[in-house]
């Protein structure tokens, strides 16, 4: 039946095109998108102690700064938030993504952006090791909401790797 249908490339499929043409879907999508954006800006405000800074700094493992690019599009493009620029610091960068004015990225240990850094190949070959050794001790954020008190709040997903990380990775991190 229809419930077992799987599209190989959903974003380019006829099914997705038809879905995007349905007014109920479009209305729900836009409503949720706006609500999540408001909640995310409120969450940033909470983290900043009142108002998000004009320059936001992102620190991550790497590799292209895609999350940073999405944050830049969300917070800086329309000019309707206090955030005017984002700077990212990464263990390594293998591509610049959408870096540009106001969206700067820096590879701290290695980088392929511009001139390749010394020993780039060695570090690049071991990216999976960096991901494992620098693993977080919590589930990923899956959404944002504004709670009953009007505060922005992150909603975390299940921490599926918790047991394995606790047994194998966290002892190495300490």
What is the role of each PLM region?
Residues 1-174:
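Long, contiguous domain-sized segments
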């Amino acid at each position: 039946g229809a419930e077992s249908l799987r599209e190989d490339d959903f974003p380019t499929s006829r099914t997705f095109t038809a879905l995007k043409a349905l007014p109920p879907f479009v209305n729900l999508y836009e409503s949720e998108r706006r609500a999540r954006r408001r909640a995310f800006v409120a969450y940033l405000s909470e983290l900043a102690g009142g108002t998000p800074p004009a320059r936001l700094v992102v620190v991550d493992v790497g590799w292209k700064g895609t999350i940073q690019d999405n944050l830049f599009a969300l917070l800086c493009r329309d000019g309707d938030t206090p955030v005017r620029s984002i700077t990212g610091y990464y263990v390594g960068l293998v591509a610049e993504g959408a870096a540009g004015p106001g969206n700067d990225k820096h590879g701290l240990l290695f980088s392929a952006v511009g001139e390749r850094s010394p020993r780039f190949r060695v570090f690049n070959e071991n990216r999976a090791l960096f991901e494992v050794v620098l693993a977080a001790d919590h589930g990923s954020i899956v959404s944002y909401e504004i709670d009953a008190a009007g505060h922005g709040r992150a909603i975390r997903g299940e921490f599926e790797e918790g047991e394995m990380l606790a047994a194998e990775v966290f002892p190495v991190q300490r």
